[in-house]
Amino acid sequence: MEQTLKIYFTSDVHGYFYPTTYGDLKRKDLGLFSFARDFKKDENTLVIDGGDILQGSAFAYYCRQKSGSPQAIADIMNDCGYDYYTLGNHDFNYGMDYQNAYIEAHHGACVCQNVVDEAGRACHPYVIHTLGNGL
């Protein structure tokens, strides 16, 4: 019996959610919102991000500098249905407090073996995930 799974993987979004570069405000074929609506999620689907989400765009800068909170970014990732994510090097740019607030607000699991807190604990060193079809 054939069993299938779907994996949607993003990486290096750098806070580009909206389909614009913000410079000229023209609609462009880019940004997480331009394709996340195509995620067809069911019990045999995983949505994963490879990091570098918190820094890079005018929107990400606004979240950090003006609101001081990554809540809006976490809300977007939650709404897109991310199951797992890891941390990229630019996710450390705004400090550990900001990053920890993001981890707390994100409903997915942060899987990252090579980053530990001051007590030596990793976010989740690994995850074993069983899909609805048993895979």
Question: Which residues fall in each region the model found?
Answer:
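Acidic, metal/ion-coordinating pockets
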Residues: M1-L135
